Design a protein with these regions (language model features):
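Venus flytrap/periplasmic-binding-protein-like
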Residues: 73, 120, 127, 200-201, ...
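N-terminal signal peptide c-region/cleavage motif recognized by signal peptidases
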Residues: 14-19
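Extracellular/periplasmic periplasmic-binding protein-like sensory domains
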Residues: 235-308, 318-320, 324, 367, ...
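Extracytoplasmic "Venus flytrap"
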Residues: 29-51, 71-78, 100-101, 167-175, ...
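Periplasmic-binding protein-like
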Residues: 87-100, 120-122, 165-168, 216-226, ...
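Solvent-exposed, acidic/polar segments of extracytosolic/periplasmic ligand-binding ectodomains
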Residues: 26, 337-402
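Extracellular/periplasmic Venus flytrap/periplasmic-binding protein
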Residues: 82, 127-128, 135-239, 276-284
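Beta-alpha junction/loop-to-helix N-cap segments that form part of ligand/metal-binding clefts
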Residues: 25, 40-46, 56, 60-132, ...
Length: 402
């Protein structure tokens, strides 16, 4: 009799737990830099993008309300891991979004895998997320170091820049960005003549720029991001480097231009998968975003990636019927084609890489610009299958043998 009662109690407890899970909100955690060098590039803007996606989807998935949380990882992997564990263990978070700073993204991806939830990296850059460190619980949405490094190195080489000096952020993202650009450079017959590593949030690039200047390289490649891009390009102009050497920022975004000005940044090449002024759909969404943004800025590609990633995630949650099993949700995301107003049609590969076209853009001159945020012109389109690393070259364990 006691054993029967115990079994019934266990069944009742399991049923109660299942009911509670079914009634609890689907929670989206946006984790990024809210207070340092990447805050203007993801920060509150990525949180807004996630909220807009939830609103546009209708506010519910699998019959459950959808909520958005956010946290500042301070660009520290240990802080990111602590936040992720608290979110997943105590706060009922089902998916973690954005993750600029690849070292943080690696740490969070591992926690998410252990807890069988979902991570969608939009701000994260390292292509290792879909390479040796791929996971059945992780999707890499917007860009990666392979796409930026290879595309820009090829474009610059075609314009005559054959000898390079790298100024590289000294963490996983910077190292990988330099490696990918170097790979394309060497394949195209170019040469690396030197390089230096810089800490994140560097305020004085003078010693690094002097080393680049004395190297005699035709191209000074900045493998840094966020506020470090703005600071290094400003100081390069002050040192007069652009008069004798080409300054190439391997990750140069729309948010860098206001701080530099069009006069200082005109002619700079960059690669984006999204630009607000591409078509009527991107313009309409971007204007809505700008009206609500804390800094009244137009969205960048990584913030757009948060929006699109949340939409596709919620579709998968509806398809699966819940958010509890992260692997099942990611499998559904891969099985369904992607389609949204910002990136258009695409798909998610077996290794977790989201595929879409990339665009080679150039910063306009002051005379070409028609006003605020009219900063770029599209030079060419890179088809999706060429924009990202071939599947069989990534060494992702999920696709071993392919």
């Amino acid at each position: 009799m006691k054993s029967i009662l115990a079994a019934l109690a266990a069944l009742a407890l399991a049923a109660t737990a299942h009911l509670a899970a079914a009634q609890a909100p689907v929670r989206i955690g946006v984790m990024n830099d809210q207070s340092s060098v990447y805050a203007d590039f993801q920060g509150p803007g990525s949180v807004l993008a996630a909220q807009m996606a939830v609103e546009d989807y209708g506010g519910k998935a699998a019959g459950r309300k959808v909520e958005v949380l956010f946290a500042d990882h301070q660009n520290k992997p240990d802080v990111g891991s602590v936040i992720a564990r608290k979110w997943l263990d105590q706060d009922g978070v089902d998916v973690i979004m954005d993750l600029p700073n690849s070292a943080v993204a690696f740490a969070v991806s591992e926690v998410v895998r252990q807890k069988n939830k979902v991570m969608i990296g939009s701000g994260a850059g390292s292509s290792d997320l879909t390479g040796p460190r791929c996971s059945p619980n992780t999707v890499h949405w917007t860009y990666d170091t392979w796409s930026y490094g290879h595309s820009l190195a090829k474009a610059v080489m075609e314009r005559g820049g054959k000898t390079w000096f790298f100024i590289t952020a000294d963490y996983a993202f910077g190292h990988d960005l330099e490696r990918q650009a170097t790979d394309q450079l060497l394949k195209s017959g170019g040469k690396v003549v030197g390089g230096v590593r810089t800490p994140i949030a560097t305020q004085d690039f003078s010693s690094f720029l002097l080393a680049a200047q004395s190297s005699g390289a035709q191209v000074v490649a900045l493998a840094v991001a966020g506020g470090d891009t703005t600071t290094s390009m400003k100081q390069a102009a002050e040192f007069g480097l652009p008069a004798k050497q080409s300054i190439v920022s391997l990750i140069f975004g729309i948010n860098n231009v206001p701080a530099l000005g069009l006069k200082a940044s005109q002619g700079a090449l960059t690669v984006f998968p999204f630009y607000w002024d591409m078509n009527e759909g991107t313009r309409a969404w971007s204007r809505k975003f700008q009206k609500r943004a804390h800094n009244h800025a137009m969205p960048n590609d990584m913030q757009a990636g948060v929006y699109a990633g949340v939409l596709h995630y919620l579709k998968a949650v509806d398809k699966v019927g819940g958010a509890e099993d992260g692997k099942a949700v990611v499998a559904a995301m891969k099985a369904m084609p992607t389609d949204d107003p910002l990136f258009g049609k695409g798909r998610i590969r077996e290794d977790g890489r989201k595929l879409h076209p990339m665009y080679l853009l150039q910063v306009k001159s002051p005379a070409e610009s028609k006003g605020d945020w009219d900063y770029f012109k599209v030079l060419s389109t890179i088809p999706a299958e060429q924009a990202f690393r071939p599947l069989n070259e990534g060494n992702c364990p999920l696709v071993a043998g392919k």
